[in-house]
Amino acid sequence: MKKILIPMLALGGALAMQPALAQDGEALFKSKPCAACHSVDTKMVGPALKEVAAKNAGVEGAADTLALHIKNGSQGVWGPIPMPPNPVTEEEAKILAEWVLSLK
């Protein structure tokens, strides 16, 4: 029993130390500057997040590409106004990308 319990406790502790993984995508979206230019349903400075999800539905590698755009910024994807780099970690960018792509 001890041989199983100790690794399980260690794994639980390691996961607890990664707050970005525990955060919900929507809460992360609201805590970062994303909402200054984007909303879920309505185009603002940037596209509505549901538009982004629809455009990328079924596209292989979309989550990775979107995560890179979120972290590093992009230009010319949705119009002439560039998206600046965002103060997010790679993990947070991935969480945000997966959340955006899950929107219907």
Curated annotation (Swiss-Prot):
Keywords, in A-Z order: Electron transport, Heme, Iron, Metal-binding, Periplasm, Signal, Transport
Impact reported for residue 44 to L: In strain: 221
GO molecular function term, any single one: iron ion binding
Chain ranges passing through the membrane: none
Annotated effect of mutating residue 56 to Y: In strain: 221
Primary localization: periplasm
Localization per record: Periplasm
InterPro entries: Cyt_c-like_dom (IPR009056), Cyt_c-like_dom_sf (IPR036909), Cyt_c_ID (IPR002324)
Purpose of the protein: Electron donor for cytochrome cd1 in nitrite and nitrate respiration.
SUPFAM superfamilies, alphabetized: Cytochrome c (SSF46626)
One GO cellular component term noted in the UniProt record for this chain: periplasmic space
UniProt-annotated binding residues for heme c: 34, 37-38, 83
Protein name (record): Cytochrome c-551
Signal sequence coordinates: 1-22
Post-translational modification: Binds 1 heme c group covalently per subunit.
Substitution effect: residue 65 to L: In strain: 221
